[in-house]
Amino acid sequence: MEKFQGYLEFDGARQQSFLYPLFFREYIYVLAYDHGLNRLNRNRSIFLENADADYDKKYSSLIVKRLILRMYEQNRLSIPTTDLHKNPFLGHTNPLYYQMISVLFAVIVEIPFSLRLGSSFEGKQLKKSYNLQSIHSIFPFLEDKFSHSNYVLDVLIPYPIHLEILVQTLRYRVKDASSLHFFRLCXYEYCNWKNFDIKKKLILNPRFFLFLYNSHVCEYESIFFFLRKRSSHLRSTAYEVLFERILFYAKIQHFLKVFVNNFPAILGLLKDPFLHYVRYHGKSILATKDTPLLMNKWKFYFVNLWQFYFSVWFQSQKIHINQLSKDNLEFLGYLSSLRLNPLVVRSQMLENSFLIDNIRIKLDNKIPISSIIGSLTKDKFCNLLGHPISKANWTESSDSDILNRFVRICRNISHYYSGSSKKKHLYRIKYILRLCCVKTLARKHKSTVRAFLKRLGSGLLEEFLTGEDQVLSLIFPRSYYASKRLYRVRVWYLDILYLNDLVNHD
């Protein structure tokens, strides 16, 4: 992100003027619509079909020049709200303009925020690794920490239903009044559109709304992490680099003034040295080793924090307390729980021997096979019973294209669920995809499955195994790989950067 700092060309007078590059820097639009920056499309399907939005294909430099000219010639901020539908710039006839402006506004604001966030890493004993961006990097942390926890608080992070709450939250980070007014105008115009098809197309590019959501959640986490550090017996420095702290301490001072009388009681209420927090996919989990009473106190705290400080209505039913030893926690497409492994250790001292019973607690991650079968059924890879069927809409493609599609899907699923403690369900998913591939090819060539396999041999199905086997053979010793014990080992691939459709089955 540092190499894009020069595109903004901020000086002392325009350091907070985000509208300046929006109106006068034509190449910032090229930066915003560079597919290299948008390669991690969060809406991209694991099935890799129709990944690009329609409006991205309509982008051209001529439209950018026309848009900048219209913004420069007229003062659009003076248009009354009642006349928005008559506005030729932000009107119903030009939804593409809003798409371009919303994406660009998010990019312009993201760059200085990212630079400040990167500066917070300086002097910290935390290495900047791209592996930390992987979703799977969370699971080793959970395996290490959750084995000492017994209760988990599953929280659905609320989102404000009123746009003005987001604008007020953004004011803590953006001090440019004109940019906030322009942002409010664009957002209200989007909300006033009655054409649902236009809204659906514009929301396919989530950069703008993702930025608003992260800004909103960041303010909530700033308060939570502050209480977490002050209430904990252990002064961990890892929390200092988890979120952006622009104008953070000023907000904390205001928070202390509001709760100045009850603040010591709050810290005593929530004191817990074994508290672990993880946020993922619009949810957050809070794990602790304490009693259910403490979890109910945290539940009460979250409800009051959202309602009274952030003006967001939040129901306590959206917070679930799970006991890891009894309940399964739905986490990033896995069903996680604690498994007790009894161990018997024999100790011998001189002529006396002792048997010591020991229990080892281990985080057990299982594959939700019923949900995945439902997703495969929805995309017509199998029926409701899990029996593979052919993909009729893929028969128009070439044989190599069909095979590559199935291999890519199978590899993605295998990499994501390689951390499962039981591979039986993973093998069933692979079997469904392999047989679905064979049935699709047989249908294309108007043949039966048996005749098609007899004609091509078993080498066709080896494409599903070669890539993964080569990777694992480089990681583990040959003797370990040949003993079949590898299939009982959990392997976390650190290249999973987005949630796929099979994981996001909700």
From Swiss-Prot:
An annotated Gene Ontology molecular function: RNA binding
Q: Which residues does UniProt assign to the signal peptide?
A: none
Which terms in the GO cellular component ontology are assigned?
Answer: chloroplast
Subcellular location(s) of the protein = Plastid, Chloroplast
Q: Which UniProt keywords apply?
A: Chloroplast, mRNA processing, Plastid, RNA-binding, tRNA processing
Q: A biological process (GO) annotation for this entry?
A: tRNA processing
Q: Which residues form a coiled coil?
A: none
Output the superkingdom of the source species.
Eukaryota
Function according to Swiss-Prot or TrEMBL: Usually encoded in the trnK tRNA gene intron. Probably assists in splicing its own and other chloroplast group II introns.
Q: Which PANTHER family does this chain map to? A: MATURASE K (PTHR34811:SF1)
The UniProt entry's sequence similarity note says: Belongs to the intron maturase 2 family. MatK subfamily.
- The name this protein goes by in its record: Maturase K
Q: Which organism is it from?
A: Arabis alpina (Alpine rock-cress)
- What's the source species' lineage? Eukaryota, Viridiplantae, Streptophyta, Embryophyta, Tracheophyta
